[in-house]
Every structure is written in C-alpha cells, then in structure tokens.
Amino acid sequence: IDKAVDEAMQARAEGVKTIKLKGGVEQKRDIELIRGIREAIGPELNSCVDANQGYPTAKAAVKITKAMEKYDLLYMEQPVEGIDQMAEVTRRVDTPIMADESAWTPQDVIEIVQKKAADMISIYTTKPGGMFKAKKVAAVAEAAGLKCNVNGSVETGVGNAANLHLAASTGIVTYGCVVPVSTPKDKGKGGIAGIYYQDDVIVEPFVYSDGDIIVSPKPGLGIEIDEDKLKHYRIA
C-alpha cells in the first residue's frame, strides 16, 4: 500500500488526472488501498478500481463497492465474472460499473445493454480483433448511450499508437485511458506512465504533457519503427 501511495503521489506530480488501482484479490486490502491513496492525494485525482473479475460473488462485490463509495470512487471495473452477475452488482450500487472482460464484441455490448449490466464500457483494439472491430464495439456503446474508455494490453509503441488513435477518434471515449508512455531507452524515461518498459521499437517517444498524450499529426499511426531495434528484439 505504501508503494501504491508513493506512485499515486508521483502520478499527481506528473499531471496524471485519473489513477486505476488493481483490486479483486484481497477485499480488506482493496479498501485499505483506496482509503490510503485518497487520504494521501485528497480529492485532486480521479480514482477507480479494476477488480478483473476477482470478487467471488455479486454479493461480495456489492459489499466492497459500497464500502469504497465514501472514498469518491469514479467507477468500479469488472468486479465479477459474467454479465448476469455484473447486472446484479450494477443494480445494487451507486458507483458506476465498467464492463471489461464481459465486453469483447459488439454482441457482448448488446447483451450488457439489454440486461443493464454496466454503466460504461472499456474498449480495446486487441480484444475484438483490431481497430475496425473496436470501432464497432464503440458504435454499439454509443447507440446505447454508454460512455467508454480505452484500455491496453501492455503493448509497446505500435500498439499504444493504435490505442491512442482509437481513443482520439472515438467521441464517446471520455474517461481516462490506459495508454503507457512508450519511450526508447536512449530518449529518457516515460515517468510513472512509462514504467512498463525499458526500451521500445519506435524511433521517437510519445509526446506527454500534463497528463495527456498528444496525438501525432504525422500520417498513419504517427510513428516510425527503429528497424535495428526490431531486429535486435526479434524472437527467431
């Protein structure tokens, strides 16, 4: 918890506006984590929890989500497995519920809407099978009036560029997105938003300013690949 608080403080110092806390393993620890971070950073940052389907039952998820509500939780992401259980949690809490693992395809989102199983949708380029299919997921969510964010699968620069363009080109993406700041090792560090990487295969790092990643005006995804690094890191 102390390490998480330190990282939250660093995120605030670097201009990050929303932080996501990983939960779903130890329920008591999850409450202590959100409490500790809220006490440390005050009301300045949005805070959300991603349980990755970790709570064993809808009843448990409802209990822990309600316990977190006093700490101004922006949303709870995928607290339980399955759309039916998600619907039960959504009905019984005031905190908005985001669907992630339950929302892979446009058909999934239709079922979520029909069962009122979430208040918002997390979109990926990877889950549905690429940018075009991700835009279909977004279109269904938009038709249903559900806001979205874009999440990533810990991609390096090419995938992050795709996620960045998906977020920037999709009007219903209004919540903070999980897009790490990919940074080649000879270009410095990406700060708290680039901690996943020691290096990257893109030539230039993403431009990061006050918590935002700036979309490149260059053609395509706006990136250039370092061919030497691509060969170096290639798995034969």
What is each PLM-predicted segment?
Residues K22-E26, Q53, T57, E77-P79, ...:
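Glycine- and other small-residue-rich loops at beta-strand/loop junctions that grip anionic moieties
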Residues R35, A161-L164, P219:
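A generic structural signal for well-ordered alpha-helical surface patches
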Residues K66, D72, E81-P96, W104-D210:
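Shared catalytic-loop signature of beta/alpha-barrel
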Residues I1-V93:
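Metal-dependent enolase-superfamily TIM-barrel catalytic cores that perform enediolate-based chemistry
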Residues G190-A236:
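C-terminal extensions of enzymes
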